Amino acid sequence: MVQWVEIDGRRHHLVGGRLSHAVANPTWNPIAKPGALHSYFRGNPDGKNPLELLKDREPLPAAYVDRDARLAVVQEQGLEAVWLFPTLGVLYEELLKDDVEAVGALMVGFNRWLLEDWGFDYRDAIFGSPYLSLADVDLAVAELEWCLDQGARTIVMRPAAVWTVTGPRSP
């Protein structure tokens, strides 16, 4: 359902057979520097386009892909704990919304990856947030129970109408 494709030397995601432009660089390498949008979220006093602010980039730091490196940064910053919330896992539900079975597979697959790579409660300091979709309520309930059994303390859901086999439902 999510595949890598290369077009004109750049990698992109193909989601449900459709080219995704949700993220300009889904490899995240290089990535915009931390705080790149600070002025934008403080009222954008210079009236800059947010895409312009994201052009200052750096190589992908290890702390963005390795939980032990992230834990070291958390400790260096004097933080007790952090939450991790997904981006692409939630974004891609929109592209798959017409295929409830694919949305369910995306949700389950994402949560297994998250648990394996980051954990839902890694050393009581990094709390990965599993993703739930209500497209299939029975599957969502089973997945929530599984996530809670694995130590999840938070969840995340797409803030939009839910698409079911009978069409959209208001949240």
Show where each model-derived region lies.
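Helix-coil boundary/capping segments in enzymes
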Residues: 1-171
